[in-house]
Amino acid sequence: MGAVLFATSCSLDQDPISDFSEITVGGKDTTDTSVKFKTKEEMKTQYDGIYKAIQNAQEAWYADMLVLNETHSDNAYCGSSGAELTSLEQQTQDGTNKNIERDWNAFLGYINTANRVINNVDLVPDQSLTQAERKQWKAEAKIWRAWILFDMVRLWGDVPVVTEEAPDITAENVEEVYPLLYPSRKPVAEVYAQIISDLNAALKPGGAPAVNAGNKFLLTKSVANALLARVYAEKPVRDYAKVIQYAEAVQNDGFKLVPDFSDLFSVNDAKTDVNFRNTSESIFEVTYPVGSGNWVTWMFGIDHVDPNSTYNWAKWITPSRDLIQAYENEGDNVRMNQAIVWGQPSWSNHYPSDHYPFMYKTRSKYNSIIKIRLADILLLKAEAYVETGNLQAAAALVNTVR
């Protein structure tokens, strides 16, 4: 999403960062107040907290992001007729929109989960936490922080760049601590500088882990390279040579397009699980295996592995007529049938109720939320080739994805 959304229309409630600074595990060392986590186990809880936050970010970092991206690109209607969603679709939102406030606060909270690791992992006195683990955990946390800052700057333009944890406020330190509790917004250029710094730091030797074919729910070097390709394609002064450079770095990590597009989303015939996780095309996906499951699937339609699931309210992200027409114009039934499913709900907000389209990719509670896949990066690289005049190379990449 290249355009900055809501930058001028909203006056957001910048809740104090201390709201997100509660340390639930560990405590202050009586001999060194700078040490919050004294054991490897305590620090591991904070590291694991990053991935738990990602799994739990289904509302702000997935459903809401889809609303903001897809309705503004005319790929979808918001679906529900609630005032918050309708104003977002119509771009008439203001500072009273609770969804925006919710996402703003959530994103600052995600950044704080990263900062807990970044700022504390090197201070843990427990030597069973190895230097290799410290470097890797910090690198993964920096990728997470950079990713959230990237989404924030694209949505809101100038945003706070929070890299420190706020200490407890007292009468003696109020002037020093106040800017940490109520951070001011930084110019877009400064935000992008922090994003690039974090991602480059994560790519240093001994930093982020290499790709793991059996676990794509991992903030790897490939994720950092993919994000850098996106960053250089969307920052105010774009650098398409770097887009190509980082896209090629992703390709060199061995990802492959899946032979069957349905492999990314399909469930098995028994409807007891998805057919595949961690495909060769996936770069980063949030997994929800049997025994856990996501809840966000029912925001878009029914849960196709649950026979009791019903269309009980007007769902989010209704595919638009423009999107459906685009598929039909290309004769692309393969992708359309994996992206859109038709149902018969009780409402007719955008279509007749006897033939109503719903988003289909996240079709069950067992489906992963695929945040980055190879096709995204190949098409981004193709765009960079177009911008640099290499139309033949761009066409070859587009045809590969097709």
Label for each model-derived stretch:
Residues R134, D158-A189, A193:
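Short coil/linker segments at helix-helix boundaries
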Residues W61-G82, V159-E172, A208-F300:
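Short, surface-exposed recognition loops and adjoining beta-strand edges that mediate ligand/DNA contacts
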Residues M1-T8:
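Sec-dependent bacterial lipoprotein signal peptides
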Residues D32-V35, T39, K44-D48, K52-N56, ...:
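Conserved, well-structured interaction surfaces
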Residues S87-Q90, E165, I169-T170, P319-L374, ...:
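Flexible, polar/acidic helix-loop-strand segments at domain edges
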Residues N252-H355:
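Extended ligand-binding clefts on enzyme/binding-domain cores
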Residues C10-V67, A247:
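Membrane-proximal, proline-rich intrinsically disordered regions
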